[in-house]
Amino acid sequence: GEEEAVTPENVGRAYKESILIRFEDSLFDMYEVDQALEDVGKGPYQNVFIQECNAMNVLMTEIKRSLVELGMGFAGELTMSEKMEELMGAMFLDRIPDTWMNLAWASVRPLASWLIDCTARCTQLQAWCDAPAQVPRVTWLSGFRNPTSFLTAIKQVIAQKEKRELDKLIVMTEVTSIESAEKVGSAAPRGAYLYGFCLDGARWNLAENVTEASKPKEMFCPMPVINCAALPTNEVDMSGLFLCPCYKTMSRGPTWVFDAQLKTKDPPAKWILAGVALILDVGE
């Protein structure tokens, strides 16, 4: 048959169908999660996952609502409103619609890539919902809408376990020799194993366990699994380490999450002047 013309309406129709199919089962059953946690109670990690699931439910509900409404517009059951036109226009340009973006996380991805990212985030949250009393062996920090809250939870757990004052604790990072999340055998003995970090402006030397200069034409260097824990500020020894800012996206600035500590043989100033940073979502 003849190929359909590439018009905003045709692109909008195609996206509407595929997105509704993609996310048809994506609402998390928070009542079930509550029941599962009734006996064991909710710790700091559980609270973060619950917040993340609730936020994702709100986003998914809006995505579905707006697409069903757009479908009614296409079918002539509703008059096309300005909001519906904007939604259709964004999909045509492969951009994340504003009404979705407002409920989502910082992202510089085009829409097609964002939807894949969205599915990956849902997968991590669903895996947690299936066994909410267990702390995951390793956590994809990039998959959280609010990654800072997970780092705070790490501090809270250590403060409770070790009877320390929460406000005197600082997040400490140790880059492990575990190259990928699949290779993590069990949960970290202290703190949590996290992945999803990329180094921008430098690379990580796995053999020597230190920061080094990037290779020519190398954009980002995926990091091994990082063990995030916490220490009282007065016990922190920064010798041989540099404070590396971690951001959610390549936009940096307002997307700052925390400062990690990375090992270096060079003076820290070298990396600071080069603008080296960890990025949680390089947004391919």
Language model segments and positions:
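Long C-terminal appendages of very large multidomain proteins
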Residues: G1-E284
